[in-house]
Swiss-Prot record:
GO terms for molecular function: antisigma factor binding; lipid binding. Negatively modulates the activity of sigma-E (RpoE) by stabilizing RseA under non-stress conditions. Although not essential for association of sigma-E with Rsea it increases their affinity 2- to 3-fold. When bound to RseA it prevents proteolysis by DegS, which is probably relieved by lipopolysaccharide binding (LPS). Belongs to the RseB family. It comes from Haemophilus influenzae (strain ATCC 51907 / DSM 11121 / KW20 / Rd). This is Sigma-E factor regulatory protein RseB. Homodimer. Interacts with RseA. Keywords: Lipid-binding, Periplasm, Signal, Transcription, Transcription regulation. Residues 1-23 form the signal peptide. GO terms for cellular component: outer membrane-bounded periplasmic space. It comes from the Bacteria. It is found in: Periplasm. GO terms for biological process: regulation of polysaccharide biosynthetic process.
Length: 315
């Protein structure tokens, strides 16, 4: 019987293993879904740095799921310590020289990029998910994925997802030219082994008073509306407050990845100039239209913010 040369056997085996690996490799969408599931279901501790063009801050975040309840803690690692703790559906804030308070919330959102909690089924109509390959972050292998809008009205994300456990290791928010606006970057990651005692600690904390949420006004109370929004954005909440005897309307909009708020108030003059301010991912743009000052604050390009403001409609 004729023997098959060893080098050809090795080559065949290599090709077979390569094809199996390719078949098992997750798509970009599957990797993103795995990331959102890992965030809520794994027990882990991360130390990370959040960087903008103006600031760099470091944090430690710990998360554990126990008895169908979620416990989490976020603490600052620079300057005076600030702490946020989560006891299931209650999130409490402790800051120096400020009154502690508690909110009804299912997760800690501060300092964490919005991409970790995004609904990628919903986003798929407005964004493309492109897998770029492999990289290393914090000593761990990561899948690299670009989240690209299908229009020119918003920013993009570059994310690095732990190949083994699905946790987000790094995210870069980039403008349309690829300039970095905001970065989340994990420095150290531990799974399970450093979380002993977290639930005991959180359960012993005396939670501060629960804040009442601002009243969400009925749609019939709204005297204005956004005449144009980028596709996928919708109204999340509308509130009306009185500040120094002046009524100020605010409306929060989101597409599930980026958010912005419109503020509308009366002004005494139509001659006020338009104002624009930008830092990192955040844009502030205001303009007076029909005796109303309309202010945009959010994570969209200036050109988009300006169009949204100028197309506000009043009844």
């Amino acid at each position: 019987m004729k023997k098959i040369p060893l080098k050809f056997t090795a080559l065949s085996l290599s090709l077979l293993l390569s094809s199996i690996a390719s078949a098992e490799e997750l798509s970009a969408k599957q990797s993103l879904d795995k990331m959102t599931q890992a965030l809520d279901n794994l027990n882990y501790e991360i130390a990370f740095v959040q960087t903008t063009p103006a600031n760099m801050d470091s944090f430690r975040y710990r998360h554990i799921k126990q008895d169908n309840k979620t416990y989490a803690q976020l603490v600052t690692l620079d300057g005076r310590q600030q702490e946020i703790i989560q006891r299931d559906n209650l999130v409490s804030y402790f800051q120096p020289n400020a009154q502690a308070f508690t909110l009804n919330s299912g997760n800690i959102v501060d300092a964490m990029p919005a991409v970790v909690r995004a609904n990628f089924d919903k986003l798929s109509s407005d964004y493309d998910f492109v897998k770029l390959g492999k990289d290393r972050v914090a000593g761990r292998f990561a899948d690299t994925i670009r989240i690209v809008p299908k229009d020119d009205f918003r920013y993009q994300y570059l994310v690095f997802i732990d190949e083994e456990n699905g946790l987000l290791l790094r995210s870069d928010m980039l403008d349309r030219e690829g300039k970095l606006l905001d970065q989340f970057r994990v420095v150290t990651l531990y799974i399970d082994d450093r979380l002993r005692g977290l639930t005991d600690y959180i359960n012993k904390v005396s939670l501060p008073p629960l804040l009442k949420e601002s009243k969400n006004e009925q749609s019939s109370d709204i005297t204005w509306s956004a005449g144009w929004l980028p596709q996928g954005f919708s109204l999340i909440r509308y509130t009306q407050e009185i500040l120094e005897n002046e009524i100020i309307d605010s409306a929060l909009y989101s597409d599930g990845l980026f958010t912005f708020t419109l503020f509308v108030s009366n002004v005494g003059s139509n001659d006020l100039p338009e104002n624009t301010w930008k830092q990192g991912a955040y844009t502030i743009y205001s303009e007076v239209i029909g005796g109303k000052e309309i202010t945009f604050i959010g994570q969209l390009p200036i050109s988009t913010a300006k169009r949204i403001v100028q197309e506000v409609k009043f009844r």
